[in-house]
C-alpha cells in the first residue's frame, strides 16, 4: 500500500505539508498505527485545502474537492496502471517495462477515504454531510477499482466464505439468482475521464 503522506513530503518540497501534530494531539505510545496514519492523512488533507486556490474551508469542501485531492495524489503513486492500448494491458506480471503511468492503488485510495471519513466525524463533522461519503466519491472509487483490475489483470473481488456441506444438503436445492449489476453512471464515466488520461493537478 502506498505511503501517501511520506511520498508527498519526499517528492513535493515546494508544498510544505506538515505531518507533525501539535503537542495537544500528540499520540501516546499505546496509540495504534491506524490512528497515527489517520492523523497524518487528516493533516495532509487539511493542508491541501489551505493550499487550494482559493483556499477552502472544511465546511465548503465537497465531493468534487475530494476527487481533486485523490487525483492530485496520483503523482505520488507506485502502482503501474496500463493504458488500454498498452501491450501489457491485463497482464498481472508484464515481461518488460512500459511508459504507462504510476498511480495510487485502489486499495490505498479506498483505505484513505475510510480514514478521512472517520477523522471528519471525529472533528465534529456529521456523517450525512461528509464529503468523503458522497456519491461522487463512491462512484469514482468503484471506477478506479474496476479499471485497475482490468489494467493489471487482478481481481479485487472478495472471497466468498465456504458453506458447510451439511448445510447445502439440508437446504433446498435451489440456486440464488445473481445480484443485478448497478448500471453505469454517466457521472462516474466523466469522473474517470481524467483518470484514464493521466490528468493530475
UniProtKB/Swiss-Prot annotation:
The keyword Repeat does not apply. Pfam families: ALOG_dom. Its main location: nucleus. Residues 1-14 have a biased composition (Polar residues). A motif (Nuclear localization signal) lies at residues 158-162. InterPro entries: ALOG, ALOG_dom. Probable transcription regulator that acts as a developmental regulator by promoting cell growth in response to light. This is Protein LIGHT-DEPENDENT SHORT HYPOCOTYLS 2. It comes from Arabidopsis thaliana (Mouse-ear cress). The gene is LSH2.
Amino acid at each position: 500500500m502506498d505511503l501517501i503522506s511520506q511520498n508527498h513530503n519526499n517528492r513535493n518540497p515546494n508544498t510544505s505539508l506538515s505531518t507533525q501534530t501539535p503537542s495537544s494531539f500528540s499520540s501516546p505510545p499505546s496509540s495504534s498505527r491506524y490512528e497515527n496514519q489517520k492523523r497524518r492523512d487528516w493533516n495532509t488533507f487539511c493542508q491541501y485545502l489551505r493550499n487550494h486556490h482559493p483556499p477552502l474551508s472544511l465546511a465548503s469542501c465537497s465531493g468534487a474537492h475530494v476527487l481533486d485531492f485523490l487525483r492530485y495524489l496520483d503523482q505520488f503513486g507506485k502502482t503501474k496502471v496500463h493504458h488500454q492500448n498498452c501491450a501489457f494491458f491485463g497482464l498481472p506480471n508484464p515481461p518488460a517495462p512500459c511508459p504507462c503511468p504510476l498511480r495510487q492503488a485502489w486499495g490505498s485510495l479506498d483505505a484513505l477515504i475510510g480514514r478521512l471519513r472517520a477523522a471528519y466525524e471525529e472533528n465534529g463533522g456529521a456523517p450525512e454531510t461528509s464529503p468523503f461519503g458522497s456519491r461522487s466519491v463512491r462512484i469514482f472509487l468503484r471506477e478506479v477499482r474496476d479499471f485497475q483490475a482490468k489494467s493489471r489483470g487482478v481481481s479485487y473481488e472478495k472471497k466468498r466464505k465456504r458453506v458447510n456441506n451439511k448445510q447445502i444438503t439440508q437446504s433446498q436445492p435451489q440456486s440464488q439468482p445473481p445480484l443485478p449489476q448497478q448500471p453505469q453512471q454517466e457521472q462516474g464515466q466523466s469522473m474517470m475521464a481524467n483518470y484514464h488520461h493521466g490528468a493530475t493537478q
